[in-house]
Amino acid sequence: MLIIKRSVAIIAILFSPLSTASNLTSQLHNFFSAQLAGVSDEVRVSIRTAPNLLPPCEQPLLSMSNNSRLWGNVNVLARCGNDKRYLQVNVQATGNYVVAAMPIARGGKLEAGNVKLKRGRLDTLPPRTVLDINQLVDAISLRDLSPDQPIQLTQFRQAWRVKAGQRVNVIASGDGFSANAEGQALNNAAVAQNARVRMVSGQVVSGVVDADGNILINL
């Protein structure tokens, strides 16, 4: 009987880390599936941390910093009460991303006819690849793009709504009042970007460009 008890204990010791790793992998899969909802519908997770360094509890609290990447090799904080451990995790995510549908020259406008969505592994893409095709509305390419090339945020800009030297309408508003005046834009700016304007008096003011090309200043 003693031999049997010892055998059971040894088996429990040998296989408990495997069971813990399996449960933790499932928890991590659920964690990243929730984080990537709407972006990826196919997530695979593998733990790279050694089994003896895994959290000691069955249901650790998992978290990541707000600016962390959600795929590739990442670090996840696992808490068991006061015990904190960082897990090295590899996340593979599959979903849609935006590519050039045809050759696009630098300075060309990105529109429905020359960009498209493609499905593939998001974790293997260049940094800051565009996932939402709506981000390219009224965008201008900053470099030549080849067919099927993933489009990155650094490769385009929004079309200028206001250009340097243009006469613009400045609208200053505050609590219960609003005033309009004209001035000259000192820089190029897209919608929702800041533009500096020299007023007739010579004073330089700064405001946000709206969809109509007005410069809005909140006082």
Curated annotation (Swiss-Prot):
Compartments in which it is found: Periplasm
Biological process terms in GO annotation: bacterial-type flagellum assembly; bacterial-type flagellum-dependent cell motility
Keyword field: Bacterial flagellum biogenesis, Periplasm, Signal
InterPro entries noted in UniProt: Flag_basal_body_FlgA_C (IPR017585), Flagellar_FlgA (IPR039246), SAF (IPR013974)
One Pfam short name: ChapFlgA
SMART domains registered for this protein in UniProt: SAF (SM00858)
Signal peptide limits: 1-21
A GO CC term assigned to this protein in UniProt: periplasmic space
Family: Belongs to the FlgA family.
Stated role: Involved in the assembly process of the P-ring formation. It may associate with FlgF on the rod constituting a structure essential for the P-ring assembly or may act as a modulator protein for the P-ring assembly.
Protein name in the entry: Flagella basal body P-ring formation protein FlgA
Species assigned in the record: Escherichia coli (strain K12)
Native organism taxonomy: Bacteria, Pseudomonadati, Pseudomonadota, Gammaproteobacteria, Enterobacterales
